[in-house]
Regions:
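Aromatic-lined ligand-binding clefts that engage carbohydrates, nucleic acids, or primary amines
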Residues: 399-414, 443, 517-540, 547-548, ...
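Carbohydrate-binding surfaces of carbohydrate-active enzymes
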Residues: 123-153, 164-165, 172, 180-181, ...
C-alpha cells in the first residue's frame, strides 16, 4: 500500500517522486502486445503509464457494459502492477483522444434535450450510471488500496470547451462519493483563459498542463497561475505531445527526433511529464475521430501511429532512443534496458474466393426496419458504420429528381442497383436527375459515418448525428416509406454474410470480397490497400478499420493476436473497384 501526496513536490511513501510517464492506451492495442509495450516504457527508465477509459467502448448501448478482451482494463492494470509500474487514469466522460465523439457514446444523441459536458441533469444522469459500473472496478487499484493508480483526472481540457464549474464539481463529487481517494487533477492548455475555466484549483484539485514544446514558457504559465491562488504544487505536463494525428487526404504529420529530445530534456529538468503517446495504436473498427475547420469536417485515419517513439506496430524509432538518451542525461541513476522490437511478416497474395452485392444481401445480414421517413443511425440503435435506406417508387416521369438533405457524412445513390452518384461535404443536397425503363424503381441511399468531431465547438453540432436527418426528396416531395438497414460490421453481421458468388464483370454496387489465408509462423502483417478504393476490412470477424485511396495511408495493420492458421478476410468496397486479390506485407504502405 503506497501513499501518494502532492505538496511542493510529489511524494511517494514520504519520499520525493518524479513522475516519468508514457501514454499507452490499452483499447488501441491487442492485449498480446500490452506486456512488451509496458516493458519498453520501463526500458526508457520511466515509472508510470497513463491511459484514458473510453465511455463509448465500455457502454456501447445504454445500460449494456463490456470489459472483455481489448477492453479488459483490469487485466491491463494488473499487468502494470506486476511490472512494478504506476498508473495515471483518466476516467472522464469526455476524452478527446482523436476518438469518435471524443469518447462519448453516440446513443446520447438520441435525446433531443441532451446538453453535453455541462451541468445538465440528463447528461449527469447518464454519466452517473456509467460511473456506477466503472468505479467499483477501479477502486481496488488505487495506490492507497495497494494498487498502482496514483491519480485520476476530472474532465479533460475543459477550459477549451466551457466554463461550467458546477459541472466540473459534479464530476469530481461523483468520483469522490463512489470512493475515489487518490488525488484528482485537471489538464488544460496553459493560457490563462483555459486554466481559469478548466480547473478546480479553488477546490484544491491539482492543476496540470498539456503542451508539446516550449516547456519553459508553458511551465512558467502554470507556475504563475498556481501562485495566483497561493499554490506551490509541482509542475506537471499531462500530455507532452511527441507527435500528432493525421487526417485523410493530408500528409502524415512528423516531428524530428532531436527536436523532441531537447524539449523532453528541458521538461524533465523542470518537472514531471507524461509522454503523449509513448506508443501509437490503431483506430480499430470505426473509432477514429474527426477534426473541424469552420464548416468542413476532416476525418482522421485508421492508424493512430501519432509519429510516437514506438510505432503503431510496436517498433522503437529514432525518437525512442533519443528520449532514452536524454532521460539518462538528466537521471543517470535510472536503470534502462534495450527495448523489444516486433517484427512483421509478408505472406504474399491470396486469390478471391467469392463476392456479395450489398444491395442483394442487406436484408439477410441485418434487420430491416420500415419507417415513414429516414432516421439518423442513432435513432435505430446504431453508433458507427454505414446505413442503407431503400424505397420503391412508381416510375411516373421521363426524368426523375432526387436529393438528400442534412445527410452525413458520405452518400452513394443507386437506381435499380446502378450507381447514380456519390456526394460528400458541400455536394450533399445537390439535385440529381435519373431515368429508368422499369415500372417500379428501387432507390438505395448508402450513407457512411466517417467519424464524429472529437474536439471543440462542434462536439454538439447537428452534424454529429449520422445518416439522413433532413429527409430524401424525389420529384420535389419528401418521399414516405423507407427501409433502414444498419450496417455495423460487427461479428454478428459478418457471421450472416454469404459471400460465395462469382464476381460480376463490372462492379456497379457496394461489394463484399472474401479471401482465405492459411498462414504458418504467425506474425504481425499489413494489408496492402493501394489498389483498393474505399471501405473497410475484417479478419476473422474483427473489424480492422477503414481504408481510402485518398491516403496518406494505403495499409491496414493486422496484429498477430487476431490471426490463426486459417483466416477469413472480408473486404467491403464502396467505390465500384473490382478487387481480385489480398496481399499481406511486412511493412506499411503510404500514398506516393
Amino acid at each position: 500500500m503506497a501513499k501518494f501526496e502532492i505538496k511542493e513536490e510529489f511524494y511517494l511513501d514520504g519520499k520525493p517522486f518524479k513522475i516519468l510517464s508514457g501514454a499507452i492506451q490499452y483499447f488501441r492495442l491487442h492485449p498480446d502486445q500490452w506486456r512488451d509495450t509496458l516493458y519498453n516504457l520501463k526500458a526508457l527508465g520511466f515509472n508510470t503509464v497513463e491511459t484514458y477509459i473510453p465511455w463509448a467502448l465500455h457502454e456501447p448501448q445504454e445500460g449494456q457494459f463490456q470489459a472483455e478482451g481489448m477492453l479488459d482494463f483490469e487485466a491491463y492494470f494488473k499487468l502494470v502492477e506486476e511490472m512494478g509500474l504506476y498508473l495515471i487514469v483518466r476516467p472522464t466522460p469526455y476524452i478527446c483522444a482523436e476518438f469518435d465523439f471524443g469518447g462519448l457514446p453516440a446513443w446520447l444523441l438520441r435525446y433531443p434535450s441532451m446538453r453535453l459536458r455541462v451541468n445538465h441533469p440528463l447528461f449527469l444522469e447518464k454519466v452517473s450510471h456509467f460511473y456506477d459500473w466503472l468505479f467499483p472496478k477501479l477502486l481496488p487499484y488505487q495506490s492507497d488500496q495497494g494498487g498502482p493508480i496514483l491519480m485520476m483526472q476530472v474532465e479533460n481540457e475543459y477550459g477549451s470547451y466551457a466554463e461550467d464549474k458546477a459541472y466540473m464539481r459534479s464530476i469530481a463529487q461523483m468520483m469522490k462519493v463512489r470512493g475515489v481517494t487518490v488525488p484528482l487533477f485537471t489538464s488544460d492548455g496553459t493560457w490563462i483563459e483555459a486554466l481559469e475555466s478548466g480547473t478546480l484549483i479553488e477546490d484544491d484539485i491539482f492543476v496540470t498542463g498539456n503542451f508539446g514544446s516550449q516547456p519553459k514558457e508553458n511551465t512558467d504559465n502554470l507556475r504563475a497561475f498556481m501562485e495566483r491562488y497561493g499554490k506551490k504544487w509541482p509542475l506537471m505536463c499531462t500530455e507532452f505531445w511527441d507527435g500528432w494525428f493525421s487526417r485523410w487526404s493530408e500528409e502524415i504529420v512528423r516531428r524530428e527526433a532531436e527536436d523532441l529530445a531537447q524539449d523532453v530534456k528541458e521538461m524533465l529538468q523542470l518537472g514531471s511529464m507524461n509522454l503523449f503517446l509513448l506508443r501509437g495504436g490503431t483506430n480499430f473498427g470505426f473509432i477514429s475521430g474527426c477534426s473541424a475547420r469552420k464548416s468542413k469536417d476532416l476525418p482522421q485515419i485508421t492508424s493512430y501511429d501519432f509519429d510516437a517513439p514506438i510505432t503503431e506496430w510496436g517498433q522503437p524509432t529514432e525518437k525512442y532512443y533519443a528520449v532514452q538518451r536524454v532521460t539518462h542525461e538528466v537521471f543517470p541513476e535510472l536503470e534502462q534496458m534495450e527495448p523489444i522490437s516486433r517484427q512483421a511478416k509478408a505472406y504474399g497474395s491470396f486469390p478471391l474466393l467469392g463476392t456479395a452485392n450489398l444491395l442483394d444481401v442487406a436484408a439477410d445480414i441485418t434487420e430491416e426496419i420500415l419507417l415513414d421517413y429516414p432516421q439518423p443511425m442513432e435513432q435505430i440503435g446504431q453508433n458507427h458504420g454505414y446505413i442503407l435506406y431503400r424505397s420503391d417508387i412508381k416510375n411516373q416521369y421521363h426524368e426523375e429528381r432526387l436529393k438528400a438533405l442534412e445527410t452525413h457524412d458520405r452518400c452513394h445513390f443507386y437506381v435499380n442497383q446502378e450507381h447514380l452518384a456519390t456526394q460528400y461535404r458541400e455536394e450533399i443536397g445537390d439535385e440529381m436527375l435519373f431515368s429508368a425503363d422499369t415500372e417500379r424503381i428501387q432507390i438505395d441511399v448508402l450513407v457512411e459515418n466517417m467519424g464524429r468531431v472529437n474536439y471543440g465547438y462542434k462536439l454538439g453540432a447537428p452534424s454529429q448525428s449520422k445518416g439522413v436527418k433532413g429527409g430524401i426528396m424525389i420529384n420535389h416531395q419528401f418521399r414516405k416509406g423507407w427501409k433502414h438497414y444498419a450496417l455495423k460490421f460487427d461479428k454478428e453481421m459478418l457471421a450472416k454474410l454469404d459471400c460465395y458468388s462469382a464476381p460480376p464483370e463490372k462492379v456497379k454496387a457496394p461489394t463484399f470480397y472474401r479471401f482465405e489465408a492459411e498462414l504458418n509462423d504467425i506474425a504481425d502483417t499489413f494489408i496492402d490497400c493501394s489498389k483498393y478504393g474505399k471501405g473497410c476490412i475484417s479478419v476473422n470477424g474483427f473489424n480492422l478499420g477503414r481504408y481510402w485511396n485518398e491516403g496518406p495511408i494505403h495499409y491496414l495493420y493486422v496484429p498477430s493476436g487476431l490471426l490463426k492458421e486459417k483466416n477469413e478476410f472480408i473486404v467491403f468496397e464502396t467505390e465500384n473497384v473490382k478487387i481480385e486479390e489480398l496481399t499481406l506485407l511486412d511493412h506499411p504502405v503510404y500514398k506516393k
